[in-house]
Curated annotation (Swiss-Prot):
PROSITE patterns: AMIDASES
Protein name from the UniProt record: Putative amidase C550.07
Organism domain of life: Eukaryota
Annotated source species: Schizosaccharomyces pombe (strain 972 / ATCC 24843)
GO BP: amide catabolic process; fatty acid catabolic process
PANTHER family linked: AMIDASE C550.07-RELATED (PTHR46072:SF4), AMIDASE-RELATED-RELATED (PTHR46072)
Amino acid sequence: MTIDWRQIAAKYCAHRDGSIPEPFKIKTLPKDTVLNVTKIPSECGLLTPKEIELTEKYDATALAEMIKDRKVTSVELVTAFCKRAAIAQQLVNCVNELFYEEALARAAELDEYYAKTGSLVGPLHGVPVSVKEHISIKNHTATASFLAKANIIAEKDSDLVATVRKAGAVFYCRTPQPQAIMHLETSSNLTGVTVNPFNRKLTPGGSSGGEGALLGIKASVLGIGSDIGGSIRSPAANNGLFGLRPSTLRLSRKGCQGAVSGQETILGVVGPLGRSVRDMNLFMKACIDSQPWLDDASLLPMPWRSVAPPKTLKVGIMRSDNVVNPQPPVARAMQMAIDQLSKNPDFDLVDVEPLDHKYSWDLISEMYWLDGGKVYYDLFNKVGEPILPLTEWIMHQPNVKPHDITAVWKLTAARDEYRNRYLKHLQAYGVDVLLTPVGPSPAPKLGEAKYWTYTSVWNLLDLPAVVFPVTTVDPKLDVKDESYIPMNEQDAANYETYSPEDYLDAPVSLQLVGKRWQDEELLAALDKIVSML
């Protein structure tokens, strides 16, 4: 009997839709012409004034403190965020599954424990946390957006989920990722297209785009994503959030589902998306204080450190990757940051030239598919799943082909050689951190996110990078320069299609890059920078 992939998707989506309680459904959905839907949760009448305040006003650190001070209960928080997540799903398609009753039961347990003992179970006690779907949660699906895996139920929590749960977090929903988990957008045959809550003609990013959209519409305060080419940073940027791509080997990936477990030429990472620098610190400290290296032999036994930034922070300014220049909104955000920081003697700004970023893309795009994509094609073919355009695009980069072991060794040596060259390149400038765009545009139009190099280069180099919001697109300020002379065909294509009206209300963010395994120093530097912006 031939399995029809449409039936698999329909069954999965029926379960998703059935997880939304009837009282949480919007009576009249906005028309498709309504692009910015970020205010609808607070205006649709489903949330109480207190629920609006709890979901909109605070970051995760503040909510954890409010629980500690007995100003709010976990049940109240979980109820508010579950209701808002249900609303968000109806507006932007950013939830794979809402497990309201399960979350409510856990929240009640935590409230009762605190009432009886006067002690918190951990630093995230009672705080609702959302999770990208391929990061396993016990008794829930772990499809990684492959239709062939749609019936797989995780038998246990991934290591990271177990750690965050032990820290007191309450998991309440899973969020979608794209087909193959390899788009800077979020579209799949399993759950459809996730759109940006600030402008539904734009992408929320990917591959942690469900998390990005959910946090962007304030239906989550802290989310867990993953990143192998920009998959935390792209959604964070597109939705005006903070998002950290940690250095590898600090947080466990055990229990994260995908197609190529065991591939080590380019390691993916897991990390947080949230509303503040201190939330990034809260998450990382909570996870690493648990000593995850005692359960995952791949991790570095490196405790989380409390550090302060240097009195004078030397910031490298990389305005462009010299392959595709940023469009006017991104260039303006860079200039805004430069102007503010240059006024303060505590910042020493130095222009830094990129080092062969075109080569970095040729290298990493080849390393993503060492078997030429065979494992992925086999999974698609197993149920006749159609290959989506962005999957086709990334799997057909010019250097993608099957490799024998000798070719893998050669490629890995080339990676290490590039890392060493870049190490010396940055040492010559003597910078503490690099300030760069996250991409050449604000959130791309749906189906058009085809330039990864502003983020993927740091995956190749394994440097920690964190995204932070700066401004929003302003059609009056971000006018197109009709006299612009492009550097090459890619740059021409990026600039010729630019129109500020297309990006109405889109957040504009920047990226700060640190030194390998100095994630603490990176966040300390960002905290100092954000205080000036």
